[in-house]
Regions:
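Flexible beta->alpha loop and helix N-cap segments adjacent to enzyme active/binding sites
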Residues: 1-153
Length: 153
């Protein structure tokens, strides 16, 4: 989770809507998962310590803290919950969040790298196919950041 993902700024409603409806081609009532570090998660969500490990794999929902701005995040379900992902220290997403800190991005909307109805991408070739078949402009891979214009030429 995070190695084969579609991600964008988790607080940017337009970006999350674009990811969900245009790229993923799925219903707007299916929100993406907010991925963040533990210290950010505890500011916005009521975490249950007994299921902490479930938050690492987006396996549990939690409620937004009452009065918190998280209730207005585009990754929040209509019932005021979110299926959060707490990223592990030194993971790829943790390193990416470090790079995004100067832009004040502390939460990423995270969704599986696939198009509605297709299985999740397995390898680089699958990822390239999703990039070609969708309006994605970039694909971040183990070999670097690939621009769609260079993939299709």
């Amino acid at each position: 989770l995070g190695n084969r993902s579609l991600i964008c700024d988790g607080k940017n409603k337009d970006a999350v809507k674009y990811l969900n409806s245009v790229v993923k081609n799925r219903s707007p009532f299916r929100p993406t998962a907010p991925a963040m570090r533990y210290d950010i998660a505890k500011k916005y969500y009521l975490l249950r310590p007994e299921i902490h490990d479930c938050y690492k794999t987006m396996s549990a929902t939690c409620k937004c803290i009452k009065g918190s701005i998280s209730s207005g995040f585009p990754t929040t379900h209509v019932d005021g919950t979110a299926r959060i992902q707490i990223v592990e220290k030194q993971s790829f997403l943790d390193q990416l969040l470090t790079k995004l800190e100067p832009m004040k991005i502390e939460i990423l909307a995270n969704s599986s790298l696939n198009v509605s109805g297709d299985p999740t991408c397995f390898d680089l070739i699958d990822g390239l196919m999703v990039c070609v078949r969708t309006p994605l402009r970039f694909l971040l891979t183990d070999i670097g950041l690939l621009a769609k214009k260079n993939i299709t030429n």
